[in-house]
Amino acid sequence: MYQTTTLKDKIKLFIIILLPILITQVSINLMSFFDTMMSGQFSARDLAGVAIGSSLWVPILTGINGIVLSITPIIAHLIGAKNKKDIPQVIQQGIYLSFVLSIIIIVIGGIALDPILQAMSLEKEVQRIAKYYLITLGTGIVPLFLFHTIRSFMDGLGQTRSSMIIILISLPINAVLNYILIFGKFGIPAFGGIGAGIATSLTYWIISGISIFMIHRVYPFHSYKVFQKILPPTLSYWADQLKIGLPIGLAIFFETSIFSAVTLLMSEYNTNTIAAHQAAMNFASLLYMLPLSVGMALTIAVGFEVGAKRLHDAKRYTYLGIMGGLFIAIFAGIILYTFDDVVARLYNSNPEVIELTKQFIIFAIFYQLADAIGAPIQGALRGYKDVNMTLVIALISYWIIGLPTGYLLANYTALEPFGYWVGIIVGLSTGAIALLARLLFIQKKSV
């Protein structure tokens, strides 16, 4: 990051920061896309099993990742204030904390997984696939959150291109491993959807190893000497990170878990409906990476300017990002509407699944438009280190307004499963309006 004076320079710098983040986020999500798409080509049951497994995993992944992402604004503020000496301490404590959180997830998952799956109305085979998909995926949790901690350090320095390179290296590896393990190639048995979990876990270990190598050997990361002196765990640093990260993580968890709750509630419908819902949701999640990336870039840009006490510049970056995110979402919606049949056929060849997927896609277009406003604003608020009210807004919008609305529409109107998607759209739209009001309040207060 560096100081800019004109709008043209701000746009140029913002694009430089945004593009690597966007490519990285899309590439990370492509792993889930490959898991779902290739499992669906194996069978509708495998698609449904991976869908249920993903619906349980994604809220945990994104929630914990939100806590880890708190390192990005902390680093951005330190760089903006020209305080580099505290960076190694922040990174090491972040790694300790991510390890502890990973172990907690593994323990809770080991205890709760079977009871949760057994409480759902699933075919036995779908339940088995979901269980072992999650178990195999879980073997990569520790390296995954180690990578995200190091990535947050890289992004906080404005070096977003480096994390992009790591993911781009790993993406074809993940696709090849999926192909081998799902369909059974080169003498290895076909694992179906479970093979997707194995492949993704192996990929997590690979990207973790590459990231460790880069901060040791690649400029400018090695100049910070992050591991030159190993420091003991310090609870006060954990508390500082959790103070920012926990509200971020919980806010993201409340948003992503509503989609998971909808998938779980849909277990009462047949396998084809579950498969079609997950196919549409999976592709919509891929599109969500666009506004999410804008939000992450705003966290860096706004955090840097706020750290340097240039509040007017922080405000200009904020509205630049919001308008950019909305433009991208409108363009993506047009593409999705035009090529709905092509998208549906990526996931399954069953005619019923294809037609249901196309119907779900119509609702997905409106869902991602609402997210295009909310996600960038959340990113800007993180740059201001304003995270607590975001948590409250997420809880009320998604769980008190969105999900009950969806449940009522699904069970008491002719919309049936599509009613849940209308509820999601209502929740996201409510959240976006509330977040905008909060942003205006913070900016006025900061003047």
Swiss-Prot record:
Q: What GO MF annotations does this protein's record show?
A: antiporter activity; xenobiotic transmembrane transporter activity
Tell me if Ion transport is a UniProt keyword of this record. yes
Q: How does it sit in the membrane?
A: Multi-pass membrane protein
Residues annotated as transmembrane: 11-33, 53-75, 95-117, 132-154, 161-183, 193-215, 244-266, 286-308, 317-339, 359-381, 388-410, 420-442
Q: Which GO terms describe its biological process?
A: monoatomic ion transport
What is the top-level taxon of the source organism? Bacteria
Q: Does the keyword Disulfide bond apply?
A: no
Which keywords does this chain's UniProt record carry? Antiport, Cell membrane, Ion transport, Membrane, Transmembrane, Transmembrane helix, Transport
Q: Where in the cell is it found?
A: Cell membrane
Q: Name one GO cellular component term.
A: plasma membrane
List, alphabetically, the InterPro entries matched: MATE_fam, MATE_MdtK, MdtK-like
Function per UniProt: Multidrug efflux pump.
Q: Which family does the similarity line name?
A: Belongs to the multi antimicrobial extrusion (MATE) (TC 2.A.66.1) family.
**Name of this protein:** Probable multidrug resistance protein NorM
Q: Which organism is it from?
A: Oceanobacillus iheyensis (strain DSM 14371 / CIP 107618 / JCM 11309 / KCTC 3954 / HTE831)
Gene that produces this protein: norM
